[in-house]
Amino acid sequence: MITGIQITKAANADLLNSFWLLDSEKGEARCIVAKAGYAEDEVVAVSKLGDIEYREVPVEVKPEVRVEGGQHLNVNVLRRETLEDAVKHPEKYPQLTIRVSGYAVRFNSLTPEQQRDVIARTFTESL
């Protein structure tokens, strides 16, 4: 169990009025803030704190969502035939806008190679 404390009495003056998180299961203390001698987030054995007195302080734990890497999806809702026709007849599709790597671009502003690449990557037979 994690308990938040403020040290009110200690032989080591650096500990006085410092805040810690005590992990009773591991026998460890994590420094939240101290005047000197201890770094923020430094973890020490509770026994290293020596003979101390403290008062408990409320600890609020907020769930943290960690995203590493992530996913990215571009959705273009149209038919393959529309893009192929836009390659052949760009004048018919001056406003045709698609998503490429998160950006909206006019299909006609892409090079022919980029247009072919978009068509090849956008339409697949199966996943």
Curated annotation (Swiss-Prot):
GO CC annotation: cytosol
Residues annotated as domain Glycine radical: 5-127
PROSITE patterns: GLY_RADICAL_1, GLY_RADICAL_2
Signal peptide: none
Keyword entries, A-Z: Acetylation, Organic radical
Residues where N6-acetyllysine is found: K48, K88, K92
Pfam annotation, one family: Gly_radical
Listed HAMAP family: GrcA
Functional summary from the UniProt entry: Acts as a radical domain for damaged PFL and possibly other radical proteins.
Protein name (record): Autonomous glycyl radical cofactor
Organism: Shigella flexneri
Gene encoding the protein: grcA
